[in-house]
Amino acid sequence: MDVEQAIPLLRIFSVEKAREFYLDYLGFVVDWEHRFDSTAPLYMQVSRAGLVLHLTEHHGDCCPGSTVFVRATGLLDFHAELHSRDYPYLRPGIEHAPWGADTLELTDPFGNRLRFNEYGGATGG
């Protein structure tokens, strides 16, 4: 078996809040959206810099409060980009984690966490 890609599913409860957080604040783009009909829950794929996420309003797809562990580079630039945006609900910092990575953790409006990790030093740690 060869694994091509793992795509986390994250539960959302408001399309408006999800768009504000993932698109406007984090800079993801919508790759596609799906609804079974005009009143059905939304299922959409968003991506940025190789990170692909599926955001779902569907009950039973997944539980809120998940954590996605992301290995990345350019954490300092990403941190500066986030702080340049007018998003009043988060002002994340970068911390050196016990597992040896510099870490920037974000919690979305639905309790899901994105934990961005840079090994070898965003902050020289």
Residue ranges and their predicted role:
Residues R11-V15, F36-T39, P98:
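Conserved beta-strand-loop-alpha-helix junction that forms the acyl-donor binding cleft
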Residues I7, R11, H54, E105, ...:
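Conserved beta-strand segments that form the floor/walls of ligand-binding pockets within enzyme
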Residues M1-R19, D31, S66-V68, E118-G125:
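N-terminal beta-strand motif that seeds the catalytic metal site of vicinal oxygen chelate
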Residues D31-G65, R113-E118:
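Conserved short beta-strand elements that form part of the metal-binding/catalytic scaffold
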Residues D24-V30, Y87-P88:
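Conserved acetyl-CoA-binding loop of GNAT-fold acetyltransferases
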Residues V15-E16, V68-R113:
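Vicinal oxygen chelate
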